[in-house]
Amino acid sequence: MSQKDSIRSVRAREIMDSRGNPTVEVDVTLEDGSFGRAAVPSGASTGEHEAVELRDGDKKRYGGKGVQKAVDNVNAKISKSILGLSATDQLQIDGTMIALDGTANKSKLGANAILGVSMAVAKAAAVHAGLPLYRYIGGTFARELPVPMMNIINGGAHADNNIDFQEFMILPVSAPNFKEALRMGAEVFHSLKTVLKGKGLNTAVGDEGGFAPNLTSNSEAIEVILTAIEKAGYKPDLDIKIGLDCAASEFYDEKKKKYILKAEKKPEKTAEELVEYYSNLVSKYPIITMEDGLDENDWSGWKKLSEKLGKKIQLVGDDLFVTNIKKLAQGIDKGIGNSILIKVNQIGSLTETLSAIEMAKKAQYTAVVSHRSGETEDATISHIAVATNSGQIKTGSLSRTDRIAKYNELLRIEEELGKNATYSGVNTFYNLR
């Protein structure tokens, strides 16, 4: 072990996220001066099986959302356990923190404390190695730029409007490279603003930078997007496909055992009726991917959805799998879904994140690297997407710097890779072959 790559200092602080809530930022410095800084994201619609984000609970300070406890855990406990360790041994460092926490869901130290350190260590190690983060994590073959899932209409828990589904996304699949994909997305985003204005609808944006208009139905949200695609000079389906994040756990009524779609004429639906409703949407519109179509605990409903649509579209488990290899293994075993959403703070360490992506790929499930609704300028997920050749990234709309930071970092990575960079477009959906 080289002394130069040993961890010399670990320092955490409380900073602000894109929603004006506190989050954890960690600085790690190695003996040779190599430095890494990472900020932790936070979700709005969280799966009940996610790793625990430690909040202070003091209502007199940030309404109880302070993260001083997590910061103190880094500065007083975690730092002592990893000082002097080699930053290049990510497995040992993450394992040490997980053991120090000692709980199944990281509730003692907080996933936000552990993850901040985990990512900052990797960044410092990359600097020490003289490599960009994507190359340090992914090695020689990291070169696939992801197809962006751009969330241009927000509903559900991400917006104060009457749309049931949380996200309506566009995927620029005909682009020759990421740079052009980003341009296509931006042009459709601006086109959509014009379309909404023309209908006299609100063009304020939600948490993830998408528009949050009041529309009469979920279908109308898709219709206005299709209009915007055409007005931007592109062909729906051929050039740009549609993605949905239904976030069904948010509109599932536990007592009634029904799904309540307030934007629909017949609001109450059983799992079977909801699957049929989705099937009709998929037949009618160029939908290629659907996330969290059913409640996270409705495994029988998920099985029906997978049997009905699993060969036609990508079915992504977010709240269902919570970036957890145990949950994912159950899903693979039961033939549920065909894709996993990867959110670093759902599981709480870089090692476990990479393990989930690896497990998904081995089972022919795709892995979609994702932001959270509460973000910062940290662009680690851009590097994770390229490092793992995941082929897909979900990081919001074409507004708000907290979202654009990830896209801009991908532009830089693509430029750095030069002729070695690849962009698979529609072929990224290897789970549908």
UniProtKB/Swiss-Prot annotation:
Skewed-composition ranges (Basic and acidic residues): 47-59
Binding-site residues, (2R)-2-phosphoglycerate: Q166, K343, R372, S373, K394
Region of interest (Disordered), residue spans: 37-59
GO MF annotations, alphabetized: magnesium ion binding; phosphopyruvate hydratase activity
Sorted UniProt keywords: Cytoplasm, Glycolysis, Lyase, Magnesium, Metal-binding, Secreted
UniProt remark on cofactor binding: Binds a second Mg(2+) ion via substrate during catalysis.
Metabolic or biological pathway: Carbohydrate degradation; glycolysis; pyruvate from D-glyceraldehyde 3-phosphate: step 4/5
Catalytically driven reaction(s): (2R)-2-phosphoglycerate = phosphoenolpyruvate + H2O
GO CC entries: cell surface; extracellular region; phosphopyruvate hydratase complex
Cofactors, names only: Mg(2+)
Location in the cell: Cytoplasm; Secreted; Cell surface
Main EC class the enzyme belongs to: lyase
Active site per the UniProt annotation: E208 (proton donor), K343 (proton acceptor)
Origin: domain of life: Bacteria
EC number in record: 4.2.1.11
GO BP term, example: glycolytic process
Ligand binding (Mg(2+)): D245, E291, D318
Sequence similarity: Belongs to the enolase family.
PANTHER family in the cross-refs: ENOLASE
Described purpose of this protein according to its UniProt entry: Catalyzes the reversible conversion of 2-phosphoglycerate (2-PG) into phosphoenolpyruvate (PEP). It is essential for the degradation of carbohydrates via glycolysis.
Name of this protein: Enolase
Organism for this UniProt entry: Leptospira biflexa serovar Patoc (strain Patoc 1 / ATCC 23582 / Paris)
Gene name of this polypeptide: eno
